[in-house]
């Protein structure tokens, strides 16, 4: 199976044994973008899911395209996931009144999950704190308060435990929102991460519990003996901080070999640390640049080399999508602007597609030969 995801939020996934495919795109901004993804990923239909209220206290809308079959009804599965209301998630004392401004800001009981863009400047936070302190009963309904309300939501400002003025949601709480364990992106012996780096990494990642739901058929196949009970082989492209691997681990899918591709060294170390703790027996191979494995004859050699040691059961990843994101305000004339799949980063989607097709071709070739693939 393979899947792809990106910073602006695209995910595409497809399983090779058996044939299973899934894709997610973040807030499809243009129909032509949706059609490009759809046509390159075997014309599978798109499925829209908002994680908020179903899998997380965070609102995170995505569209998915999958050929995985056999999911439980989403409401039935989600009913088994404990999603806390905002006040409970924050640990707000039940005997203290909830601030009026917070009732307006978080009226839908869902915090924001675009945390990569929500690193508020100290000056902005101070200004908002001063305004709320001077207007303690405000519900932020006045036209003049529209900018304050917007910043509170964008920056994920929540009532502080020691008072009613806003404070920035802690990184540990953001990790929980995104479905990771506390400290997943934290520093360890091998590396040090700053608050800003952790927020950026989390903002670029999957909402783990949502992806876990979409991957549940993999567990069913493993339990039924259709996938190796000792563990599957996963090729994770644009791996980030390992959201897909964490999702598989959460639902109980065992891992045997994991090949990850991620250009950022800090994110690779986060995944390395997680693998050592949670999948110490799995073979972990790291790649840096997907282009090294997706161009010319070397791409076929790369896939064959992996499959010589056993079939690839899941290909999963997330190419950068800032060039197709509605949040991108840079001119389309610039490589970093909203220029579609011709942009500096989003064109890597096609590298993902190339590798996925090579995997399928090699699997089919080995099947015709009666091989192990």
Where are these regions (language model features)?
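Conserved active-site and SAM-binding loop architecture
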Residues: 1-373
């Amino acid at each position: 199976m393979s899947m792809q995801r990106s910073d602006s939020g695209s995910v595409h996934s497809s399983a090779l044994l058996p044939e299973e495919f899934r894709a997610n795109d973040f807030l499809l901004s243009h129909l032509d973008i949706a059609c490009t993804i759809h046509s390159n990923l075997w014309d599978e239909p798109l499925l829209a899911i908002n994680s908020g209220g179903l899998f997380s206290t965070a609102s995170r809308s995505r569209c998915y395209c999958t050929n995985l079959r056999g999911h439980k009804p989403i409401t039935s599965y989600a009913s088994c996931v404990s999603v806390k209301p905002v006040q409970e998630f924050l640990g707000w004392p039940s005997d203290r009144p909830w601030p009026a401004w917070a009732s307006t800001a978080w009226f839908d009981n869902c915090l924001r999950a675009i945390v990569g863009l929500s690193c508020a400047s100290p000056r902005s936070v101070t200004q908002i704190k001063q305004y709320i302190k001077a207007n303690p009963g405000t519900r932020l309904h006045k036209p003049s308060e529209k900018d304050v309300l917007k910043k509170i939501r964008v920056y994920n400002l929540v009532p502080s435990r020691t008072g009613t003025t806003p404070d920035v949601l802690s990184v540990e709480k953001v990790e929980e929102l995104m479905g990771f364990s506390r400290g997943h992106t934290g520093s360890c012996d091998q590396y040090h991460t700053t608050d800003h780096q952790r927020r950026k990494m989390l903002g670029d990642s999957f909402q783990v519990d949502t992806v876990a739901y979409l991957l549940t058929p993999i567990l069913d196949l493993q339990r039924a003996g259709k996938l190796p009970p000792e563990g599957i082989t996963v090729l994770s492209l644009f791996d980030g901080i390992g959201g897909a691997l964490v999702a598989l681990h959460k639902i109980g899918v065992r891992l045997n070999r994991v090949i990850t591709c991620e250009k950022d060294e800090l994110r690779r170390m986060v995944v390395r640390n997680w693998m050592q703790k949670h999948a110490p027996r799995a073979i972990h191979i790291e790649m840096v640049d997907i282009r090294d494995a997706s161009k010319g004859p070397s791409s076929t050699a790369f896939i064959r080399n992996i499959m010589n040691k056993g079939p690839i059961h899941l290909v999963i990843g997330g190419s950068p999508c800032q060039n197709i994101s509605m949040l991108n305000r840079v001119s389309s004339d610039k490589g970093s602007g909203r220029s579609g799949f011709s942009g500096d980063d989003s064109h890597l989607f096609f590298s993902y597609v190339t590798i996925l097709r090579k995997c399928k071709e090699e699997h089919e070739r080995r099947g015709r030969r009666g091989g192990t693939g």
